[in-house]
Amino acid sequence: SITYPLKSIKVTSPYGYRCDPINGRKSMHHGIDLQAHNEYVYSMMDGKVEKVGYDARSGNYIILRHADFTISYCHLSKVHLAPETPVFAGTIIGKSGSTGRATGEHLHIVTKHKGIIFNPKILFCYVKSHQK
């Protein structure tokens, strides 16, 4: 099963080249930014917590492993789970925030298949086509 990472989805910055909102230079945005204001963040698929951490760019983040896929959820105000915790599609994994290198509160998602980054829009389209 698969679901969206938020109750409602509004893309504020898509995957691809863009003008960086902090330094103004053109750069690759390796994820997708979603509008989120202190909202619960949900696991998109069944899997387990691979890593929980903090860094200056991503802020508080959690990485979930779903077989050959990983999904990183970044800039969280809170992470609710520890590494190795099993998750199911729809499990609350944290709360959105603006930690790290962010211009405001949002959810940044990075998706990988076998370690290769791909456009999260592909998963979002899959969710949309499989909703009941």
Predicted regions mapped to residue ranges:
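Surface-exposed, glycine-biased beta-strand/turn segments
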Residues: 1-60, 89
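Residue-level recognition of beta-strand microenvironments
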Residues: 14, 52-53, 79, 96-99
